[in-house]
Amino acid sequence: MVTAVMILIDVIVLLILGIVVYKTIQNISKAKIESLEKEAEEILVRAKKDAEATKKEAILEAKEELHKLRNDFDKESRERRNEIQRLERRVIQREEALDKKSELLEKKDETINQRMLEVDQVEARVQKLYEERRAELERISALSSEEAREILLDEIRKEITHDAALMIKDIESKAKEEADKRAREVITTAIQRCAADHVSESTVHVVALPNDEMKGRIIGREGRNIRTLETLTGVDLIIDDTPEAVILSSFDPIRREVARMALEKLIVDGRIHPARIEEMVERATKDVESSIKEEGEQAALETSVHGLHPEIIRLLGRLKYRTSYGQNVLKHSIEVSYLAGLMASELGLDVTLAKRAGLLHDIGKAVDQEQEGPHALIGGDLAKKYHESPLVINAIAAHHSDVEMQSLEAVLVQAADAISAARPGARRETLEAYIKRLEKLEEIANSHEGVEKSYAIQAGREIRIMVKPDKVDDAGTIELARNLVKSVEEELEYPGQIKINVIRETRAVDFAK
């Protein structure tokens, strides 16, 4: 009995131990499973993070590669454009060289033909003289001694007359050489005593920025700021990869100066929006007008020319913003005034008259875009309008031989103008031709009815026309653009194509009280 009870107890103990062991194993297994599941989840999360990082890295690398390709493409495009421009310049230079050679050959042909004609004439004269001598000898053989003596004296008289004519010609030639030598001495002395600085003008101006973020503010939302500034000033704003700088491009130096001053004021002020831009452009325009007056007064003071009419002084100041073949017209006028005065002093002429006429000789260039006719005649009319003396008026009008000169001072002004212009490096013809083409383009646009103002931009590849909204409706802008296209094609020679951009803007302004 005791044995059976012990066995039963052992069985129960074993059973309990088995259950405990089973539960323990089950708990351990469950804990391991949970640990493995948690570890698997962590591995999965890490894998997702790694995948996301790899994805971002790949996207970043792709963007960098795209940016690099885009920069390479832009660089290659710029290089190709530069190469095309260089080739165009070479073609133009070759064409000019061929034209010059063609003209030279034509002149040589004319010279050869003239020489051949002269040779034929000489041969004819020789033959005629031969026949005359032969006839004369035949006649003399039948004359008496007295008749022969008379003929001999007549021949001697003719020979002496011929020798006297040669002597007179030689004296005249020596006198002319002496006069030329004296003239060269006068001009050389004047040039040696006159030293003037010249700076060839360009069509661009670089405005420094405090940082590159300012470029975005200048452009404005959807480009409204840059459009407003370009429309109000007629100047191209070039914003490229140049760090902390924007470029102002315009063939008209006055517009470029107004745009520069307005932009610099806006940068300092910090408030850049269309209304503020209009205010600054208006203020800059007034500042430029004030500067023009100061430049005119300074030129008159520098050359000691006094008693000028205020409007003449203003026109003189405007010449600072005009160039002729790359030469600043105001500095050119000052140099001509100096040269004319110095030559007048050497020759004992009226120095004051020569300097005054020299300073004012190109005054017509200050308004010749607004009036028809040669600038010399326009300048003469202006001088007459503002009560200059008749000799000054004549010297101005005659410096390109448009009218007859009435004084020696007028001759000196013409000579001084030629000396200043002919100095090596003083002028560049290609820039002047380019500027004249842009001026002609604006002149064609302004000649149409309803046009308020026009600006040639993009180096002459685009003309922007602002029309009067009360005279031209929306349909009229299309018709105006077509008429302008026809006029430009008929009246202007240009490379490539020109974009005609007609803008009609209507504003309604009222005030709430």
UniProtKB/Swiss-Prot annotation:
Write out the GO cellular component annotations: plasma membrane
- Which residue windows are transmembrane per the record? 1-21
Q: Which UniProt keywords apply?
A: Cell membrane, Endonuclease, Hydrolase, Membrane, Nuclease, RNA-binding, Transmembrane, Transmembrane helix
Membrane topology per record? Single-pass membrane protein
Q: Name one Pfam family in it.
A: RNase_Y_N
Q: Where is the KH domain?
A: 203-288
An example Gene Ontology molecular-function term: RNA endonuclease activity
Where does it live in the cell? Cell membrane
Q: Which GO terms describe its biological process?
A: mRNA catabolic process
- The residues covered by the HD domain are 329-422
Question: Does the keyword Transmembrane helix belong to this entry?
Answer: yes
EC class of the enzyme, as a word: hydrolase
Its job = Endoribonuclease that initiates mRNA decay.
Q: Which family is this sequence assigned to?
A: Belongs to the RNase Y family.
This chain belongs to the protein called Ribonuclease Y
Organism, as annotated: Clostridium beijerinckii (strain ATCC 51743 / NCIMB 8052)
Q: Which gene encodes it?
A: rny
